[in-house]
Amino acid sequence: MKLVFAGTPEVAVPALDALIASGRHEVAAVVTRPDAPAGRGRRLVASPVAERAEEAGIEVLKPAKPRDPDFLERLREIAPDCCPVVAYGALLPRVALDVPARGWVNLHFSLLPAWRGAAPVQHALMAGDEITGASTFLIEEGLDSGPVYGTVTETVRPTDTSGDLLTRLAFAGAGLLAATMDGIEDGSLEAVPQPAEGVTLAPKITVEDARVDWTAPALRVDRVVRGCTPAPGAWTTFRGERLKLVQAVPLPDRSDLAPGQLAAGKNNVYVGTGSHAVELLWVQAQGKKPMRAADWARGARITEGERVGD
């Protein structure tokens, strides 16, 4: 089939690579978000998908909005059979959805209908899911509600961050998306409507969502830290400034600290929660680079009874 691939961040690149490598489909063009300012100099930088497409000699389209007339005209000229999508980053209007003969097919990083929305991996970790996965589905105008072509499952590991899990899902999902394109082309796949039961929502994680509540159980604190790493980053406050929690582990054998109470040893930093303590392994103080929590504690000269989160 002739394809136009839509995607923007690094997590979409494995799927683009899989489609290019398949040899069965022609990736005629790529649609991605416009170049965005990055770094200290705020220099405009192309998206990872745009860079990969340019390396492969594929035409790159960067509409400010997917309803732009010039973009729609070019899309109609290309006349794709199908448009696979991975983390494109903009809502597709009906006028765009109607262009490809076989629609737009999205790779979503959850087992639909669970975790519909912008942050499925983060929400799966924060909810304590033991199994998650990826789904391919036909895009409709509802939120991730279209009929599903296929799924792949992935076991959540005890130390997974959202970054770890998303990386694995990106590669597993790439194979799923390529197989979905094959099945659509040869007629062996039929999309199945999502069940009405089991729908959960995964809205974008806000900065406030990532703030650690030290009165919550240690297991919840652990899930928030892992679910919000690397972005937006779990955090608390210390002496009136924000402190990012990069890595922490629950300690079920220690329960002598009040919620938020700090205890610093030579090589360890502990914080009390609503159940037992957690050990902080890596933190990032405001305006600093990530560092070992023990090094941070020595520099901060933590005194007995000090707390985080006040």
From Swiss-Prot:
Biological process, per Gene Ontology: conversion of methionyl-tRNA to N-formyl-methionyl-tRNA
Gene Ontology molecular functions: methionyl-tRNA formyltransferase activity
Residues that hold (6S)-5,6,7,8-tetrahydrofolate according to the record: 110-113
EC number(s) from the headed UniProt entry: 2.1.2.9
Source species, domain of life: Bacteria
One Pfam family hit: Formyl_trans_C
Keywords: Protein biosynthesis, Transferase
GO cellular component: cytosol
Substrates-to-products reaction catalysed: L-methionyl-tRNA(fMet) + (6R)-10-formyltetrahydrofolate = N-formyl-L-methionyl-tRNA(fMet) + (6S)-5,6,7,8-tetrahydrofolate + H(+)
HAMAP family per record: Formyl_trans
Family statement drawn from the similarity comment of this UniProt entry: Belongs to the Fmt family.
Function: Attaches a formyl group to the free amino group of methionyl-tRNA(fMet). The formyl group appears to play a dual role in the initiator identity of N-formylmethionyl-tRNA by promoting its recognition by IF2 and preventing the misappropriation of this tRNA by the elongation apparatus.
The name this protein goes by in its record: Methionyl-tRNA formyltransferase
